[in-house]
Amino acid sequence: MYAIFKSGGKQHKVIKGQTIRLEKINQSIGTQIKFKKILMCCNGTHITIGKPHIHNNFILANIINHGRHKKIKIIKFNRRKHYKKQQGHRQNFTDVLITNIHNNYREQNNGS
């Protein structure tokens, strides 16, 4: 079973037991969090697509680490004008462990 959810303006495809790196989440390490913006869920035989989200489905995850990415340098430079500007940036991130994907799919009988 896998699911696609939205967090931090990005979409992520996950399976149970996977560790993923997300934009910073302001919770402490060890906290269990619930993602409710599920865009798609597949249980092996049936695919459910949300419009835009699937209601009553959620993903449970535990926060395992906070950190910062490597520094990137932003450089603006104009030749012959004696102009050079440098800036650095480090993005914060959170590592989470997916513990459960809760899928509320129930097969409906169409009378046949």
Swiss-Prot record:
<comment type="function">
    <text>This protein binds to 23S rRNA in the presence of protein L20.</text>
</comment>
<dbReference type="GO" id="GO:0003735">
    <property type="term" value="F:structural constituent of ribosome"/>
</dbReference>
<keyword id="KW-0689">Ribosomal protein</keyword>
<dbReference type="GO" id="GO:0005737">
    <property type="term" value="C:cytoplasm"/>
</dbReference>
<keyword id="KW-0687">Ribonucleoprotein</keyword>
<dbReference type="InterPro" id="IPR028909">
    <property type="entry name" value="bL21-like"/>
</dbReference>
<dbReference type="GO" id="GO:0019843">
    <property type="term" value="F:rRNA binding"/>
</dbReference>
<comment type="similarity">
    <text>Belongs to the bacterial ribosomal protein bL21 family.</text>
</comment>
<protein>
    <recommendedName>
        <fullName>Large ribosomal subunit protein bL21</fullName>
    </recommendedName>
</protein>
<keyword id="KW-0694">RNA-binding</keyword>
<dbReference type="Pfam" id="PF00829">
    <property type="entry name" value="Ribosomal_L21p"/>
</dbReference>
<dbReference type="GO" id="GO:0005840">
    <property type="term" value="C:ribosome"/>
</dbReference>
<dbReference type="InterPro" id="IPR001787">
    <property type="entry name" value="Ribosomal_bL21"/>
</dbReference>
<dbReference type="GO" id="GO:0006412">
    <property type="term" value="P:translation"/>
</dbReference>
<keyword id="KW-0699">rRNA-binding</keyword>
<dbReference type="InterPro" id="IPR036164">
    <property type="entry name" value="bL21-like_sf"/>
</dbReference>
<dbReference type="GO" id="GO:1990904">
    <property type="term" value="C:ribonucleoprotein complex"/>
</dbReference>
<comment type="subunit">
    <text>Part of the 50S ribosomal subunit. Contacts protein L20.</text>
</comment>
<dbReference type="InterPro" id="IPR018258">
    <property type="entry name" value="Ribosomal_bL21_CS"/>
</dbReference>
